[in-house]
Amino acid sequence: MRKFPSLLAQRLNFGEGPLAGRIKTATNPDGVIADNSMIKMIDASLREGALYRFRDPATGLGDEGKMVKLLNNFWSAVETVFTDDWDKKPRYSRLLHGVGILALGSLMDEIDQVHQDYKGEPGWTEIPSYTRFVEELNRIKPLCAWSGGVWNFGTDIDGQPIVRKWNELQNLSKDISLVTDFLVMNYIKAVNADINT
């Protein structure tokens, strides 16, 4: 199963999309994104996220063209919305760090799920467009602190604020979960607020 996510990561790295030349591999040592983070993000999406519906369960492979298009639309939108962080190395910004890649991958899956609820509406497309992803990412942009300031993650069970400086976030599952849950929860909150107005 691991081979296919790796193949998709290569397609992104050596294609013409926003991630071209950005994923660090043995053959592309100048990339800024750890290939392991990108492969993990793709693997999670294939298992139960936006890429799942393009899979062929019999082979574990799937419609590469549609998968690459969805990933390119999303990461192009990330580049637009977080343009100040896009060219920074992970030590200067957590956007293209393992934390950012994996948290945003989960958000991509959530945005896609919301998008599927609009099936049948005028102008609906099977794959969310770049513009759609930009609109949806802008909902959570003000909450992000990829390269400066602090993240305000709410409060813990004792009512104490959970505040983390941007550069305190490490590529650890607890930090990745913290950012992922925060972004997904606030995205859903924003979507629901729209529906109810």
Where are these regions (language model features)?
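Accessory terminal alpha-helical modules
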Residues: M1-T197
